[in-house]
Amino acid sequence: MYELACELFPICRSITGAGFRQSLKILDEAMGGGILKIHSIASGSKVFDWEVPAEWEINDAYIITPDGEKICDFKQNNLHVLNYSTGIDTELNLASLQEHLYSIEDMPDAIPYVTSYYKKRWGFCIKHEDRVKLKEGKYKVFIDAKHHENGVLNYADLLIPSTQKTKDEILISTYLCHPSMANNELSGPIVAVFLAKWLLGLKERKYNYRFVFIPETIGSIVYLSKHLKHLQKHTKAGFVLSCIGDDNAYSLIHTPSENTLADKVALHTLKEKNNFKEFSFLDRGSDERQYCSPLVNLPVVCVCRTRFGDYKEYHTSKDDLNFISEEGLQGGLKAMQEIIMNLEVNEIYQNTVFCEPNLGKRDLYIDHCKREGRVENILSFVAYCDDKNDVLDIASKLSIQAYELKDLIEKLKTNQLIKII
């Protein structure tokens, strides 16, 4: 997983353009090739209250100081250029240049990430420690950038089919539009790719799984404009993957209601993990903003390791390949696999016999003791099969993950002691 991050990291991405397309192709190749369906929508297209912006092309950018030194070199770090900057080729004095520079005073050794998708302006991002050293004099500024009004916005999706006869879907959404930042950008798509590969390898799938790779905000708006009715009808739970590759925490941003299946299964799965943090929808920040908006109202939560904005490296050059790790990415993947396994096993069951079942005559008492060490789990599980509690409810009472009850449930079903409601 980390190797894929290293391959993607240097690419200059934005909400449109060649870098985004190149990154989609790399993700597709990581899945075996020909897996992702890549789509486009024309610049200028109306999508709800928004308009798809002109496609951005960036080739080079730098500043030449009065001493002849090249600084803010785009080819050294693509964060140096204001993302979606207009082109410029001119000379100006320091005071005029300062109006187009962005830095972080309390993080003097970091390059900030700044965008201007919907307002045409030019600019550079610079370490504050370098900014304060700038001398009076003439500066040459050069940005080789264009905005193509006849361009496109790209996105990709993948539908992994259920092995059962159902149209119910689980949505996995992630974004791919940030340039060289590791946790905020690459961790979500990488975890999504490996999650999809894992799902494709399962022999049985209760749900259909819809994976969406988009530019943040405008991409989810575009996707909803194309698929809103279908998603509203068939989505049972959804998960936005963001900032899911570090080692420091596990985080959940709830839906507005906090009572959907997505809220329930994510909380059940993550709450016992180290340094778990739970947030309300007031702390939203990624594409859950669109999926959970009032007229859309999809059951979608956001799953992170350390939540966006809660680590000082966020939206700076410090969010680099040292901030994520193979272990962090694997932890994010495992968390999502557990969420899926808990969803897959979840049903509402009802007992088929009065009082406690006789486990001994069905050889369940001995078998279960050997396998689980305690007979209490099987009796407690049956005790809560009241056609109201689902498996997630019962597993929470037993302080175990729902998927750990899978074999027990199969035994009870085989012996016709429970039935699905």
Task: Name the predicted role of every residue range.
Residues 1-421:
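N-terminal hydrophobic/helix-forming segments and targeting peptides
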